[in-house]
Amino acid sequence: NAIPGNYYRWPYAKVPYVID
């Protein structure tokens, strides 16, 4: 549910994460 280079919005909000 996260795109490399973008922010992980679920379940977190505006958290810089790089997950597949």
From Swiss-Prot:
Q: What keywords sit in the KW lines?
A: Hydrolase, Metal-binding, Metalloprotease, Protease, Zinc
Q: Does the keyword Protein transport apply?
A: no
Any idea of its EC number? 3.4.24.-
What cofactor is needed? Zn(2+)
Q: Which domain of life is it from?
A: Eukaryota
Q: Which GO terms describe its biological process?
A: proteolysis
Q: What class of enzyme is it?
A: hydrolase
Q: Looking at the keywords, is Secreted present?
A: no
Q: Where is the Peptidase M12A domain?
A: 1-20
| GO terms for MF | metal ion binding; metalloendopeptidase activity
Q: In UniProt terms, what function does this protein have? A: Active against casein. Has a role as a digestive enzyme.
* Protein name as catalogued: Astacin-like peptidase p18
Organism field: Argiope aurantia (Black-and-yellow garden spider)
